[in-house]
């Protein structure tokens, strides 16, 4: 509407191309901004989204205060995917957590030991991860009206940018 008032008309394809070019740049800038600002207690979980009618796994982690740690989309749900996620999270945050809380996914204990080290305490409890499960709702509610994705690349781009922007704009309560 702002552009129409000024006499500028863009085809839908141009807007989609801008998104494809600018979304990764925005995502990387926000990831760099987050480095070193993450707590030492992580909550990790995975959920699934539809891509071309198939289920693809979205690994997500937040810290104790609800700040985003990392997001990774994987076609498989196993130890290799969990290790890739923890490597990515360690690279993004620049630190190793003291404690990781997860549900009962069997790939997490081995991946945590292999990537983060033996000294990281791993808690397995379905109910302690509840605020992360609730956090999945934000991305699921955004994806549901779209009916899934047509390509894995667009799903990766969307999931990463959506969570990064949502984390950057969310209201925070600081402890005094």
Spans of features found by a protein language model:
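Residue-level recognition of single "structural anchor" positions
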Residues: 1-176
């Amino acid at each position: 509407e702002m552009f129409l008032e000024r006499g500028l008309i863009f085809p839908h394809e141009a807007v989609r191309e801008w998104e494809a070019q600018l979304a990764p740049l925005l995502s990387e800038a926000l990831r760099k901004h987050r480095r070193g600002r993450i707590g030492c207690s992580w909550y990790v979980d995975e959920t699934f989204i539809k891509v071309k009618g198939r289920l693809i796994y979205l690994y997500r982690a937040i810290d104790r205060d609800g700040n985003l740690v990392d997001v990774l989309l994987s076609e498989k749900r196993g130890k290799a995917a969990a290790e890739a996620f923890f490597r990515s999270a360690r690279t993004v945050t620049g630190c190793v957590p003291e404690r990781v809380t997860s549900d009962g996914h069997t790939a997490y204990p081995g991946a945590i030991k292999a990537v983060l080290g033996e000294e990281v305490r791993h808690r397995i409890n379905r109910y302690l991860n509840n605020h992360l499960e609730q956090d999945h709702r934000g991305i699921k509610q955004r994806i549901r009206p779209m009916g899934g994705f047509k390509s894995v690349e667009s799903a990766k781009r969307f999931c990463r940018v959506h969570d990064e922007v949502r984390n950057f704009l969310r209201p925070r309560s600081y402890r005094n």
